[in-house]
């Protein structure tokens, strides 16, 4: 694994725990925490579902790339990326060269359990959210694994934080 340069970038599907674990890691490392989805919504002045509604997924992805470019140049950060950030090669290259990339992995059933009551996830506003998560998982899991420096199972938050801290200190 490449040396940890003070930038931890978390990737994975929605519900994998990127934001929750990211906040915990930032606190433990005494770093600043950023959630790219939050930053996109703040910059746009509207929630993510509204961006999807007004601009479609492609418009959202363009905003995502612009925000990632601004965030990855900051020192000592933990960055939680949106689940689809890795869909664009430009984003994958950007995060790979900018920091240590960790794929937080969880199976679709766990992801559904974690996102079931969250209406702010535009891609899950479908008749069968589990089928949609399985479809996203099948398409994205290989990309996450190729992009990440390493993969961590996203289960118990405390244990996952400890695992990440150990991996970063190697």
Swiss-Prot record:
Recorded coiled-coil stretches: none
Keyword Kinase: yes
PROSITE patterns per the UniProt record, alphabetical: SHIKIMATE_KINASE (PS01128)
Residues spanning the signal sequence: none
Keyword vocabulary terms for this entry: Amino-acid biosynthesis, Aromatic amino acid biosynthesis, ATP-binding, Cytoplasm, Kinase, Magnesium, Metal-binding, Nucleotide-binding, Transferase
Chief place of localization: cytoplasm
Pathway(s) annotated for this protein in UniProt: Metabolic intermediate biosynthesis; chorismate biosynthesis; chorismate from D-erythrose 4-phosphate and phosphoenolpyruvate: step 5/7
Cofactor(s) this protein cannot do without: Mg(2+)
Role noted for this protein: Catalyzes the specific phosphorylation of the 3-hydroxyl group of shikimic acid using ATP as a cosubstrate.
Family: Belongs to the shikimate kinase family.
Protein name: Putative shikimate kinase
Organism: Neisseria meningitidis serogroup B (strain ATCC BAA-335 / MC58)
Taxonomic lineage from the root: Bacteria, Pseudomonadati, Pseudomonadota, Betaproteobacteria, Neisseriales
């Amino acid at each position: 694994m490449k040396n940890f340069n003070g930038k931890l970038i978390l990737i994975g599907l929605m519900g994998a725990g990127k934001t929750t674990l990211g906040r915990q890691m930032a606190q433990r490392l005494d770093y600043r925490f950023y959630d790219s989805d939050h930053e996109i919504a703040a910059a746009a002045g509207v929630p993510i579902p509204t961006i999807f509604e007004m601009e479609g997924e492609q418009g959202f992805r363009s905003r995502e790339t612009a925000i990632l470019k601004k965030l990855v140049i900051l020192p000592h950060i933990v960055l939680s990326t949106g689940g689809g950030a890795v869909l664009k090669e430009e984003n994958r290259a950007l995060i790979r060269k900018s920091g240590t990339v960790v794929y937080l992995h969880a199976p679709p059933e766990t992801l559904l359990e974690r996102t079931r009551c969250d209406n702010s996830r535009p891609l899950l506003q479908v008749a069968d959210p589990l089928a949609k998560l399985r479809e996203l998982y099948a398409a994205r899991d290989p990309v996450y694994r190729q992009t990440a420096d390493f993969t961590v199972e996203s289960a118990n938050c405390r244990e996952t934080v400890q695992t990440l801290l150990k991996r970063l200190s190697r």
